[in-house]
Amino acid sequence: MQNENKLGVMPIDKLIWNMSLPIIVSMLVQALYNIVDSVFVSWVSEASLTAVSLAFPAQNLMISLASGTAVGVNALMGRALGAKDQKRADTVAMNGLFLAFVGFVLCSVLGLTLSDAFFRSQTDVEEIIQMGNQYLMIVMGASFGIFGQLMLERLLQGTGHSILSMYTQGTGAIINIILDPIFIFVFKMGVTGAAIATIIGQICAFIFALILNLKKNPEIHLVFRGFRPNWRIIGSIYAIGLPSVVMMAVGSVMTFLMNKILITYHSAHETAATAFGIYFKLNSFVFMPVFGLNNGVIPIVAYNYGAQQRTRMVEAIKRSAIYASCVMILGMAIFQLFPATLLQIFKATDTMLSVGIPALRIISLSFCMAGACIALGGSFQALGKSIYSLIVSVIRQLVLLIPVAFVLAQIGRSSGNDDLVWWAFPIAEVFSLGVTLLCFRRLYRTLISKLPPHGPENVQ
């Protein structure tokens, strides 16, 4: 097939940008709508922004399940296509859609039943709890849009149709940006309006992605009649994707615990947690392009692994690490030079500026190391070694970051230097880069180096 041949024969530099650029553009649009969403909410009140910020760990946990499952589907499908196994590729795709539906049901039930307890575990401010409940119950209760959208976009990406996935994601983001001010300000619905605008955008993107897969993606055949779950395929999907789910979920746990540390020990309490939430919104403009690059490279590595093209695999991994590091260094420079300007977008108060400016400058020091970690983590996922990514993520965010942040917060509280807590991020990133390099060295020695350089037909 033409798209298969593109993954296997197009020059690596050209192929990386051919695959990644549409995803990068769509993810930048996604980052824009994430920020616009929070900006509009911040114009209602700081309490509204705090509610949405405290909802982030639960919302991200849901997206972790959806995206991590899709990672497993994408990698497994890429290998099947690389090995010319069309039937297996189709089976993987259909089981991926089944898992997306199961994930929606699970998150819907959890969101509708546990939302109140989740917010009360973080704060005792009743206004924040009530607004947070309104937001989270809607976003999780109607999450079939985001589950379907992410899975179907990965099917498009995995078959070389990255430009089509850009259309679907961009459509959802633009609809959300248009509807946000209408629901929040015209209809005076506040955070509830933000949640409704979000799910409408996700549902529209889901429907559009389904149509594109059925009409414009001949490499995958979606046949719903007579479908039965294939538990062996599902097991293989999660053998690859579950570490990715857990890895991203670890980020939710980290954010939840970090919010607890800030609210308890930082002198600014909820305002410090809100500033931390703003940082996460802003850093998406830096990290989203790198994740887009990574998502474009994963099917390249997976396909060439299936085709036993070692030279192309290594070149793709090396180039992606270089490009990712360049993006992250640029992002670090922006955070160092313009932190106040970035925070003022969210109508930051003087207290939030005093907390947020040093936070952005200190945390962003970790960016220059994160690029290589993300790029090499993508190669782990593509080659079915997501456990390495999981190990790195757990070490960085739970084993190191949270304990170090807890200790530094205690020291900062007693010494009157609240800014100490933010140094936990660059400290943890230094160690995670070292662990990532060790894992990649092991992967290269045990797996990559054993493949023929240019395919099995060239083995002497």
Task: Indicate residue ranges for each PLM-predicted region.
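Short loop-to-helix capping motifs
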Residues: 125, 161-162, 190, 269, ...
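Transmembrane alpha-helical segments of integral membrane proteins
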Residues: 374, 400-411
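Short alpha-helical transmembrane segments in multi-pass integral membrane proteins
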Residues: 1-20, 77-144, 186-242, 301-366, ...
